[in-house]
């Protein structure tokens, strides 16, 4: 029998969703399984085996991943070093003279690369591309050895004005790659060969920061699939909505910073086009976040630069979207001013909402919906639970919200939903009405 199934996999913070499309018959099947945060490749394969029990028929797997997104937001990337031009080790800290709190007297920011691991060498390329000072290969070797001794598993090479003439970076890269024990070497001019030193340094440094976790994840993924005695082509969704090979994703993980949400926007555009709608707003509400994007005249809104978090500037083409912490697993709480707030902390899939009965006693948006009867406790989706614990959800809403605000349990649950809806509608206004659409 010929290979004929194309698999789409979206790994989110709470659930992993799978769609299997049989090209010959047009038959579509879907599956949902809890994400395995400790190793996303485990939930990935479990989900595929739910959608189809014969991997020998799978020809292509298209994967939207949040590994890079989570590593950036949770600051769980690899220990990284930077080798740069003398005098420019603090480019990541100086940024563009912005501050975490615009109206505060002071603010703190810690770059993903520690200062002790940002090393300088004597080299200089001028703005016109002429080389004033050539590199000293021994100096590059010494810096590499120092970074390895400091425990760095990835390195970024960034020379000032490298975009005008990459010769010094190319020579230094050759030396660096001959010494570095793995492939986790990011060269700034290879990743972003254009003017603006902060954006180039930030993008290249974050690429290096992501290389080990993303590469390790993709290698585990390939291993798990090969263990099923099947060699399927795996394509990774990029932040701009396109796809790339696994090898490209390993070397340029920065392009996957918004991989999962971007895939959803592209799908929504195609569905809207087929239905005859050219202007739409997409909303992707998962367990952890709510992602929205605007599509005008059947075209995705693209941006060349985005901040994943303060100081984490990425300059690479990506679909423009806004993300807020208002997913099904977002935790409701009373803030320091006595007001009801939703997120950004999420219960995820483990322990999950209080109604999962796995140890979380704080109310989530899902718990509020269950209390209000909007979710059938006997038929939950996702396959993790045969039923949901209505009493646990009720108790969580009562203990953490209702009693503190002197409300009935029903009114407290209604308030949680209203706050979540207000946050979502505010984000929708931000990308549409406030931009003139």
Each language-model region and where it sits:
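N-terminally biased helix-coil "hinge/interface" segments that flank
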Residues: 1-437
């Amino acid at each position: 029998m010929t290979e004929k199934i194309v698999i789409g996999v979206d790994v989110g913070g709470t659930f992993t969703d799978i769609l299997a499309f049989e090209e010959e018959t047009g038959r579509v099947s879907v599956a949902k399984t809890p994400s395995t945060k400790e190793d996303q490749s485990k939930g990935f394969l479990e989900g595929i085996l739910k959608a189809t029990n014969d991997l020998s028929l799978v020809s292509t797997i298209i994967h939207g991943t949040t590994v890079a997104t989570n590593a950036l937001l949770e600051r769980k990337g690899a220990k990284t070093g930077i080798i740069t031009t003398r005098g420019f080790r603090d480019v990541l800290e100086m940024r563009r003279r912005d501050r975490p709190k615009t109206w505060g007297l002071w603010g703190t920011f810690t770059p993903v690369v520690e200062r002790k691991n940002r090393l300088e060498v004597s080299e200089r390329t001028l703005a016109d591309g002429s080389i004033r000072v050539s590199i000293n290969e021994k100096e590059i070797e010494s810096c590499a050895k120092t970074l390895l001794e400091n425990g760095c598993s990835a390195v970024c090479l960034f020379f000032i004005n490298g975009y005008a003439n990459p010769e010094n970076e190319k020579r230094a890269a050759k030396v660096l790659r001959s010494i570095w024990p793995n492939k986790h070497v990011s060269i700034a001019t290879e990743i972003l060969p254009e003017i603006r030193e902060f954006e180039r340094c930030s993008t290249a440094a974050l690429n290096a920061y992501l290389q080990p976790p993303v590469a390790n994840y993709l290698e585990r993924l390939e291993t798990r699939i090969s263990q099923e005695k099947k060699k399927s082509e795996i394509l990774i969704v990029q932040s701009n909505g396109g796809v790339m090979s696994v090898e490209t994703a390993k070397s340029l993980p920065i392009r996957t910073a918004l991989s999962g949400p971007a895939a959803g926007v592209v799908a929504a555009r195609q569905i809207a086009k087929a239905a005859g709608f050219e202007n739409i707003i997409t909303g992707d509400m998962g367990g952890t976040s709510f992602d929205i994007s605007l599509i005008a005249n059947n075209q995705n809104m693209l941006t060349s630069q985005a901040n994943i978090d303060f100081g984490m500037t990425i300059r690479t083409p990506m679909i423009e979207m806004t993300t807020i912490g208002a997913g099904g697993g977002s935790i409701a709480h009373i803030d320091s001013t006595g007001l009801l707030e939703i997120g950004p902390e999420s219960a995820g899939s483990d322990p999950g909402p209080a109604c999962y009965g796995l140890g979380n006693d704080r109310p989530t948006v899902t718990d509020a919906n269950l209390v209000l009867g909007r979710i059938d406790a006997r038929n939950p989706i996702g396959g993790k639970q045969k039923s949901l614990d209505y009493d646990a959800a009720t108790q969580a809403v009562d203990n953490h919200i209702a009693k503190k605000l002197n409300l009935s349990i029903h009114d407290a649950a209604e308030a949680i939903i209203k706050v979540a809806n207000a946050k979502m509608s505010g984000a929708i206004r931000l990308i549409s009405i406030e931009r003139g659409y």
